[in-house]
UniProtKB/Swiss-Prot annotation:
Belongs to the podoviridae head-to-tail connector protein family. The gene is 30. InterPro entries: Connector_podovirus (IPR020991). Homododecamer. This is Portal protein. Pfam families: Head-tail_con (PF12236). The keyword Nuclease does not apply. It comes from Enterobacteria phage SP6. One of its GO terms (cellular component) is viral capsid. Forms the portal vertex of the capsid. This portal plays critical roles in head assembly, genome packaging, neck/tail attachment, and genome ejection. The portal protein multimerizes as a single ring-shaped homododecamer arranged around a central channel.
Amino acid sequence: MQDTILEYGGQRSKIPKLWEKFSKKRSPYLDRAKHFAKLTLPYLMNNKGDNETSQNGWQGVGAQATNHLANKLAQVLFPAQRSFFRVDLTAKGEKVLDDRGLKKTQLATIFARVETTAMKALEQRQFRPAIVEVFKHLIVAGNCLLYKPSKGAMSAVPMHHYVVNRDTNGDLMDVILLQEKALRTFDPATRMAIEVGMKGKKCKEDDNVKLYTHAQYAGEGFWKINQSADDIPVGKESRIKSEKLPFIPLTWKRSYGEDWGRPLAEDYSGDLFVIQFLSEAMARGAALMADIKYLIRPGSQTDVDHFVNSGTGEVITGVAEDIHIVQLGKYADLTPISAVLEVYTRRIGVIFMMETMTRRDAERVTAVEIQRDALEIEQNMGGVYSLFAMTMQTPIAMWGLQEAGDSFTSELVDPVIVTGIEALGRMAELDKLANFAQYMSLPQTWPEPAQRAIRWGDYMDWVRGQISAELPFLKSEEEMQQEMAQQAQAQQEAMLNEGVAKAVPGVIQQEMKEG
């Protein structure tokens, strides 16, 4: 890494102007993200010092769905108690091994230890809480920046605290992170430069200064990093490789030519709005029905004040017909609203992988139904899994390997993701195996003449073709014939040996008689 010391000589940094330029392109995406946050988790898009309430209106379905899906994705892509990746070598890494006379199979144990060390390093950086928060932002806002400082825990940076710039193909060109730091956190030389840049303005140690960190792509896999306090250059200019970049800008999905991503909530904001609207109607209707009013007949003989102030079980003088309780009778009107609300809630449950919301309402729900529904919901996220394997899991794995040792670079090692889309593929293969077993046992229910008419080899091949199942553990026709031939030969040898064994005593007795 090459460092260049930046000294303040009256020059102003251009980073704040770049921030303003890129912020204009971010504005429409940020406005939409704040709208979606009101339907789900409002606190995600609150600025520091905002007095806005964090209550999400009249419903909690959006918050429940977002929290559930965020935790679900974190558990699937980054499962506890085991590594989400395994270490593999690139072509260059294998060549280095060959030059040293080593074999790849000899390093399996070493790679396992490296994976464990990398996972421990990530755990010490508290990456799991940050990952859950990242998924919440991606679901609601569509964008989030995963930041790894030089020391301490990783953090999920909301989209209103950073800006990005991409080319038409979506490749990242610029990232600017905005942080507010107290003046006393800077070293004395930097603090003096900041005060000089402010034209002698006396600053207190607790005054906050806007610290911009700008990462600019320099080509050939390298990035330049500069910092400025307001518009005053501070620190050093660094040149680092891509895998050492402390930023991972993430998106849920992104259209061609756009710098910013779009969230899952955008696709289903209509459903969330209807849930909000109907929940408000239900709550207001229930409040009206809970409001008790009494009608007093004009000229009644009942003492109204005594009636109002009397306790439970107290004797009151009066006529029952003088006082009447007003009932709105709106319960029947709320019933269809509740039914429609349940339909929309189930639709949100399907998208946000909430199995309990999508399961049919019945006394007996079979295990097959539960497994089928869970698999369908997982498959709906297949595209998201494959995207995050490249944009999130692989860079985080490289971070862990970098923490384990500087020699683990992208030129030599290639982390292979073993969760998410890979695990989903293995689950589908097991499902095919279960279907194969089911169809193979099906002919046993047929009449005996039909069973005798089956060519079992052809039937097995036909079933495998229908369910597109590759079962490498099944023996081929040639292997079956070879085994049958070996068994027949073994039987012949056994019979021959048995015959010889029986004949030997007779031969011996005959020789003894002749002798």
